[in-house]
UniProtKB/Swiss-Prot annotation:
ATP binds at G332, P333, N334, T335, G336, G337, K338, T339. This is Endonuclease MutS2. One of its GO terms (biological process) is negative regulation of DNA recombination. It comes from the Bacteria. Keywords: ATP-binding, DNA-binding, Endonuclease, Hydrolase, Nuclease, Nucleotide-binding, RNA-binding, rRNA-binding. The keyword DNA-binding applies.
Length: 788
């Protein structure tokens, strides 16, 4: 794609906007290299990957990029066999953890929606938890190694601690004995050796080694001879500690070296995911959608918005071309929004061709072009001494030389900057030359001659930007099919120009021209009314949709309540039946006891008959319950449009409005609801409804499957009581969603909130274990909870 067009369309500002959402500098490099792709397949795939990331953001919240660092340099050093610093190792460990957690982030149940491209990328991740654990167990901070890094280091540091305690006791004793010679009763350390501050005039009274003196020379820092051996022992231990730390770092670096291919692979994937999710986050910030893409030259942008204009001020744009016409000529007065229309169209095109979602309504369509050429604005060069006209013409000549049927050309004020008659004629010739090649064109102009050209030329359509004569302001709405009108007379009249002057001016214009302008005015008025009617219709449609949603919610609520009541009733009935059976068995036992004690067999016979009748009634009642729960009706092997079917999960009948699709789903009109139901879940209408119990279970399963739970909860700003309440609910949802571990963000602060949360976690039945966050996870500001 030619850089000039990208520059005038302000494409690079879009890339700057995306960079705000990256986590690694390696991903920033990918954004710097981003440009429109060279094939339809690439464009579709990259839009789809952005859309998948966007949907994951909406469903699962922020991806696990905490602690995702650019480790390119560290990995390169490890590959060459160098020993890495603690900070570098921590960053590599964080990157590996980020990669592993991404596999958990995209995991889903079999029946839930899959994300083909993102899952395919993540399938290449090779979890290296062993390396992660070794790094995080050994290294606490960028300059701090854990005592647990090795048994040798633990032993050395324990010895150091003991030696330091011994030397402190000894130096304190010496200070007491030398107190009258000291500047102050405080020991200090110089060159990693314990020393005491002796007044210069008493240095002979304290035998030892002089290590330093104060700035005034009044104090000498002396290491008493009695401390020399202990200081030497401490120095030896410190050297051993340093050597052991270097050995540990070499060992950890060697672990990375052994798995360098997998480490580099994971680093590359994390960088790619960072890039993809940055695109998705930017899409969310501009309220973007994924457009359809074709290679037929068809553009249909619905309510498109320029992403760099303030959302509160931007006017949505509707523009289409490529079916009935391939060239669009936008005419009308200056400052009417023609250039914004041109830039919006071009920018949304190159955004989509770069795999980005665009700020427009769902189902907008963008065409793939091999090149987008733009001649917009005044980019004349002072050094080249080019006039406005010459500057534009130089660019236009280049466009005419290169543009073909797979190109989109955007002209702003074509033919301007020279004599109007010649400029208009030249503009028509340029448009006609490109049109004959099949080039797709959007051009703006204020020449009336181009209106006539568009009216009489095949595949060329007029358009204008609406102007409100009442307020003397443009509305910036594009009216396709209606040429622009200058409105000079109306504007002049409203600004106070005398009527007789305006009438004299009218006489200077031909009757045909005036009639044509009046026709344009009438068309614009009708278009405005049509727009108003359309907006009213859309408003009514939205209201109807809201009413439908409320109705469905009420129906669902009523159905759920009814099912719950029926389920409870059946459960209670079963309980009564079981109790009655137990009572009947007790009666029989009593009868046998009576017979044993000598009561007549006749009495026993009557009791036996009574018991049998009771048992039969109970069995009949139980069987009727079981039948109603068991009998769901006969399954359907196929359906046809217009057929009446029964939907057990809703306990409703419906009419088939579309037959089975590739997913095995059938379109059903059930009351006012239009729903898709799996064919296997439909029954013939002459069968009994599904049991309320099973229906309730299915609804619960559906709700669980649809519900998404974030990987973390943020409690900052809440008091302890509210935080505990929210965390308790969140842990229930996370457990039901099958999450393995979650993060509770409570902040560092005074520790009150953290302690309250930890106390609650000890008692929660879903919690297997919990710990404070490691480096890159949030440290003591978060608690990582592992669920059962």
């Amino acid at each position: 794609m030619n850089e000039k067009s990208l520059r005038v369309l302000e494409y690079f500002k879009i890339k700057d906007g995306i960079k705000k959402y990256i986590s690694t500098s390696a991903a920033k490099k990918l954004i710097d290299e981003l440009e429109p792709y060279g094939s339809l397949y690439e464009v579709k795939e990259h839009i789809e990957e952005t859309k998948e990331a966007f949907e994951l953001l909406m469903k699962k919240g922020a991806p696990p990029f905490e602690g995702a660092y650019d480790v390119t340099e560290a990995v390169s050093m490890a590959e060459k066999g160098f020993s890495l610093a603690p900070g570098q190792l921590l960053k590599v460990g964080s990157m590996l953890r980020c990669a592993r957690k991404f596999k958990e982030y995209i995991s889903h149940k079999e029946e839930e929606e899959s994300y083909r491209i993102i899952e395919d990328i993540c399938s290449g991740i090779i979890p290296l938890k062993n390396i992660e654990d070794n790094i995080f167990n050994a290294i606490i901070g960028e300059e701090e190694i854990s005592d647990k890094a090795s048994t040798a280091l633990y032993s050395i540091r324990r010895s150091l601690k003991d030696k330091n305690a011994s030397i402190k006791d000894k130096v304190n004793a010496m200070m007491r004995s030398y107190s009258k010679y000291l500047q102050e009763n405080l020991y200090t350390i110089r060159g990693e050796r314990y020393v005491i501050p002796v007044k210069a005039e008493y240095k002979a009274q304290v035998p030892g080694l002089v290590h330093d003196q104060s700035s005034t020379g009044a104090t000498l820092f002396i290491e008493p001879m009695g401390l020399v051996n202990l200081n030497n022992e401490i120095k030896e231990l410190m050297l051993k500690e340093k050597a052991e730390i270097e050995r540990i770092l070499r060992e950890l670096s060697a672990l990375i070296y052994k798995s360098i291919v997998a480490v580099k692979n994971n680093e590359k994937i994390v960088t790619e995911l960072d890039f993809i999710f940055a695109k998705a986050k930017y899409a969310s910030s501009i309220n973007a959608t994924a457009p359809h893409v074709n290679d037929k030259g068809v553009i249909d942008i619905v309510m498109g918005r320029h992403p760099l204009i303030d959302p509160a001020k931007v006017v949505p744009l509707n523009i289409y071309m490529g079916r009935e016409f391939t060239s669009l000529v936008i005419t009308g007065p200056n400052t009417g929004g023609k250039t914004v229309t041109l830039k919006t169209t071009g920018l949304l095109e190159v955004m989509a061709m770069s795999g980005l979602m665009i700020p427009a309504r769902e189902n907008s369509t963008i065409s793939f072009f091999k090149e987008v050429y733009a001649d917009i604005g005044d980019e004349q060069s002072i050094e080249q001494s080019l006039s406005t006209f010459s500057s534009h013409m130089t660019n236009i000549v280049r466009i005419i030389d290169d543009a073909d049927e797979d190109s989109l050309v955007l002209f702003d004020e074509l033919g301007a900057g020279t004599d109007p008659t010649e400029g208009a004629a030249l503009a028509i010739s340029i448009l006609e030359a490109l049109r004959k090649r099949g080039t797709k064109i959007v051009a703006t102009t204020h020449y009336s001659e181009l209106k006539a050209y568009a009216l009489k030329t095949e595949n060329v359509e007029n358009a204008s930007v609406e102007f409100d004569v009442e307020t003397l302001r443009p509305t910036y709405r594009l009216l396709i099919g209606i040429p622009g009108k200058s409105n000079a007379f109306e504007i002049s009249k409203r600004l106070g120009l005398s009527d007789y002057i305006i009438e004299e001016a009218r006489k200077g214009i031909s009757k045909d021209t005036l009639e044509f302008e009046d026709l344009i005015q009438n068309l614009q008025t009708r278009s405005v009314k049509a727009e108003e009617n359309l907006r009213k219709a859309e408003f009514l449609k939205e209201q109807a949709e809201k009413f439908k949603e409320k109705y469905e919610e009420k129906v669902s609520s009523i159905t759920e309540t009814r099912e719950k009541a029926l389920h409870e009733g059946r459960r209670e009935a079963k309980k009564i039946i079981e109790e009655a059976k137990s009572e009947a068995d007790k009666i029989l036992k009593d009868m046998r006891e009576m017979e044993r004690l000598g009561y007549s067999s006749e009495a026993r016979q009557r009791l036996q008959e009574s018991r049998q009748k009771l048992k039969e009634k109970l069995n009949n009642a139980e069987e009727s319950l079981n039948i109603s729960e068991r009998d769901q009706g006969e399954a359907l092997k196929s359906v046809k449009e217009g057929e009446e079917v029964f939907i057990p999960s809703l306990n409703m009948k419906g009419i088939v409005i579309s037959t089975q699709d590739s997913k095995g789903e059938v379109g059903i009109q059930a009351g006012i609801m239009k729903i898709n139901v799996k064919l296997k879940d439909l029954r013939k209408t002459n069968n009994n409804p599904i049991s309320k119990k099973e229906k309730a279970v299915k609804k619960r399963e559906a709700r669980l499957n649809l519900k998404s739970v974030a990987q973390s909860i943020d409690l900052r700003g809440l008091d302890s009581e509210e935080a505990i309440y929210k965390t308790d609910i969140y842990l229930d949802e996370a457990y039901m969603a099958g999450l393995g571990s979650v993060t509770v963000i409570h902040g560092k602060g005074t520790g009150v909130l953290r302690n309250a949360i930890n106390t609650m976690l000890k008692k929660n039945s879903h919690v297997k274990s919990y710990r404070l966050g490691n480096f890159g996870e949030g440290g003591t500001g978060v608690t990582v909870v592992e669920l059962k």
